[in-house]
Regions:
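Surface-exposed beta-strand/loop patches in extracellular or lumenal glycoproteins
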Residues: 255, 486-500
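Loop/helix patches that line or flank the sugar-binding groove of alpha-linked glycan CAZymes
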Residues: 50, 54, 270, 277, ...
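Bacterial lipoprotein signal-peptidase II cleavage site
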Residues: 18-25
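Substrate-binding cleft/loops of secretory-pathway carbohydrate-active enzymes
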Residues: 153-163, 279-312, 383-392
Length: 539
């Protein structure tokens, strides 16, 4: 029997055995419950329009609500993102990660999903998404979607059904207890929430109940949802909160063995489509989830703080950067900040607006191994909003122009306050300035695109000496040499392990001399203060 039919029968049964009748003595009317779209979705791979290993070119994270408003309602939308695709292409990234675009209860960040197969009404329609995907592919850009498997919205039809009675067809889709479990504390609070039919598990918020992923029909439904989007041509997913998928007790609610197994299963599904990519968010165990048996790519939490601290000149962080990729997969997703305040403020605010150090941070993660993720506006040095705090301060309208009313984001009043530095740090102002952050990001991404060793090569000979980091990137016959001086004074980098007698031709910045290795593969290079140098071994 289909789930909707089961629910209808259950509602009638509850009404018949009912209780609480009115003065007329007749049975109460049947409970009206929303339907749940559980239609199976078979795989129908449309193929891939992208080159192999496309993700290593870099991915721009976009908060759709805050990127570009196309229809004058003060809220960003999918059509607005489509309008800005030429800008994204010219930035030099290879793909876009869209923060949640599905219908949600929160109508803001989108992580309280109320419909997994429909687009948020303010963002547009499925047709708008199809247009965005097609236009992105025409420009060589991929599109990955945010997917929330851990929890749904409280208003999701499955949870409305699940919470209707202590026994129903969707009860096991969520985590329930008849009595209030004790001894639990997650994120400083009790994760169990009271409802009329019991207690449900919702550590993030009462409005975001956790799915019961031990329930096979729930997992099968999620897989159908993934195929729904993959069949439309999206190029992969970013999976939210994968460390929270299963709980085995008050002291065992994060990064449980079942989490890794399920994500490995999901990876197999995504990998069944040509040339797709997935990345997972798991701050508690990035390396575990980044392993091939699980997600095969995860955000490198911890590394991102080393990048920022190295840019500040902290030598301990410089040393950590020299060793990180010796022990982790090259598929780890690197970043300096994102949409969550727990990952840090906007990079501009973390570095106090120091442009030289900002460029060092950018060069560090854009030239090292990994899949680099750039948070929208990072490339122009957007700050947070002075009038806001927490996550909202990080999710402001994109600063396209210096217009004090809307920063070029909308013809109407924007849904949220602008970034504090929108008047100075905006695309229009920086476009024509060769020294601006925007053009520095373009240059670093162009280097990564021009030299495959910088995108996908090994990282060898990494050495940290005080505030100077040096390493080689090698892929096949191509080898690049990178030297970064995070210090406030020029310093010599003593290099070894180079190809004997080889010439290393300067690629960045202009005006730097070439380097020639000795017969034993050694060289010494003086790096100016707060500078990145890039060389390419001559063929």
């Amino acid at each position: 029997m289909k789930a909707q039919g089961m629910l209808g029968a259950l509602a009638l049964a509850l009404a018949a055995c009912g209780g609480g009748g009115g003065t007329g003595g007749g049975p109460p009317p049947p409970v009206s419950l929303p339907s749940v779209d559980t239609a199976p979705v078979p795989a129908a791979d449309p193929g891939s329009a992208l080159p192999a290993n496309w993700q290593y070119g870099g991915i721009l994270e976009i908060y759709v609500r805050g990127y570009q408003d196309s229809d004058g309602d003060g809220v960003g939308d999918l059509a607005g993102v489509t309008q800005r695709l030429d800008y994204v292409r010219d930035l030099g990234v290879s793909a876009i990660w869209l923060m949640p675009i599905t219908q949600s209860q929160d109508h803001d960040h989108g992580y309280a999903v109320s419909n997994y197969r429909e687009v948020e009404t303010q963002y547009g329609s499925l047709a708008d998404l199809d247009t965005l995907v097609a236009q992105a592919h025409a420009r060589g850009l991929g599109i990955i979607l945010d997917y929330v498997m851990n929890h749904s919205a409280q208003t999701h039809p499955a949870f409305v059904n699940s919470s209707n009675a202590a026994s129903n067809a969707f009860r096991d889709w969520y985590v329930w207890s008849s009595a209030h479990p004790t001894g639990w504390s997650i994120y400083g609070g009790d994760p169990w929430r009271s409802a009329s039919t019991g207690w449900y598990f919702a550590p993030f918020s009462a409005t975001m109940p956790d799915f019961n992923l031990r329930n096979a029909p729930t997992v099968a439904w999620h897989k159908d949802n993934l195929r729904f989007w993959l069949n439309r041509g999206v190029d992969g997913f970013r999976f939210d909160a994968v460390g929270n998928l299963f709980e085995n007790g008050p002291g065992a609610w994060e990064a449980q063995p079942e989490n890794y197994a399920l994500m490995g299963d999901v990876r197999a599904l995504v990998g069944g489509y040509a040339n797709r990519y997935m990345v997972c968010e798991a701050p508690a165990d990035p390396l575990g989830f980044g392993a091939g048996a699980a997600c095969a790519s995860a955000f490198a939490f911890g590394h991102h703080t080393d990048v920022v601290n190295a840019a500040k000149g902290q030598t301990g962080a410089v040393a950590a950067l020299a060793t990180y990729f010796a022990a982790v997969p090259a598929s780890m997703a690197t970043m300096v900040s994102n949409h969550d305040s727990f990952a840090g403020a906007r990079l501009w605010d973390q570095l106090g607006g120091d442009v030289a150090r900002y460029k060092l941070a950018a060069a560090t993660y854009l030239l090292q191994p990994g899949v680099p993720f750039i948070y929208y506006g990072e490339e122009i040095g957007m700050s947070g909003a002075a009038s806001l705090s927490g996550d909202a301060a990080l999710r402001t309208p994109m600063s396209w122009t210096a217009n004090p009313a809307n920063a070029g984001f909308s013809s109407a009043t924007p849904f949220r306050a602008l970034s504090a530095n929108a008047a100075t740090n905006n695309v229009a102002t920086e476009q024509g300035d060769p020294n601006a952050l925007l053009n520095f990001y373009r240059s670093m991404l162009a280097l990564r695109r021009a030299h495959a060793s910088l995108a996908r090569g090994s990282m060898d000979g990494a050495s940290a000496s005080g505030a100077v980091l040096s390493y080689r990137r090698t892929l096949g016959a191509e080898q690049t040499l990178v030297i970064v001086n995070y210090g406030s004074a020029s310093a010599a980098a003593s290099l070894s392990g180079l190809t004997a007698n080889a010439s290393y031709l300067a690629q960045w910045p202009s005006g730097v001399g070439d380097v020639t290795a000795s017969g034993s593969g050694d060289a010494s290079v003086v790096a100016p203060a707060q500078t990145v140098l890039v060389f390419l071994r001559a063929p």
